[in-house]
Amino acid sequence: MITSLNGIIQGGVSVKDFSTVTEINLDDSEDILNNFVDNGFGTLTDSFYYFEAGDKLKIAISFLQHGLPLDEISIALDWRDFEGLTAEILSSKNFAVIKNLMLTKPRMEIDVVGIRLGIAILIDCKHWKTYSQSSLSSAVRKQIERTKQYVAKTPGSTAVPVIVTLH
C-alpha cells in the first residue's frame, strides 16, 4: 500500500501508468486509485486520475492514521513532502506552524517552526537515507546557528534546535 504513494503525481495518471510506476498489478491499482477518489484524494475524469499539490501528503497522513509505519511512508516522500509531513505532525499536536521561515543578515532558512506554550521548535528536515558523522555534525552546527539568529531576532523568544531525519 505504501508503494502507491510513488504513483501519486500532479496531473493525470492512468491505471496502467500507476501500475507501472508502483509495480502493483492493474486490478489492484485501479482499486487503490478508486479508493483514493472515494476518500477525497484526487478526481477521476475520462479514465485519468488527477491529483493536486498536497494530495500525496494527505494520503501519507491517512496512512499514518491507519497505523502504517512512519519510516516506510517517509521514504516514499520527497523533501518537500517530508517537510510538509513534519509540519502536519506538529499541527496535529496543537503547534502553530510556520514553514520555510527566512531570516536575513545573514540569510538563513528554517524548514519548519512549531510554536506552543511560548517555546519555538526550529526544525531542519533532512531527507537523508544515509549520512556520515561529518554531515550530521555540520547540520547540527548550522541548526544551532539558525537557532541563535532566530532568538536574537525574536525578542523574548525561547527556541530549541531540532533535526529530523529518516534514519
Predicted regions and their residues:
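A short acidic/basic microdomain associated with nuclease active sites
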Residues: 87-106
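Active-site beta-strand-loop-beta-strand hairpin of nuclease catalytic cores
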Residues: 114-124
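Cell-envelope/extracellular polymer assembly enzymes that use nucleotide-activated donors
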Residues: 111
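Interdomain/boundary linker segments immediately adjacent to catalytic/signaling cores
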Residues: 3-81
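Catalytic cores of nucleic-acid endonucleases
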Residues: 125-167
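Surface-exposed alpha-helical segments enriched in charged/polar residues
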Residues: 3-6, 34, 88, 141, ...
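Short beta-strands and strand-loop turn motifs
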Residues: 68, 124-125
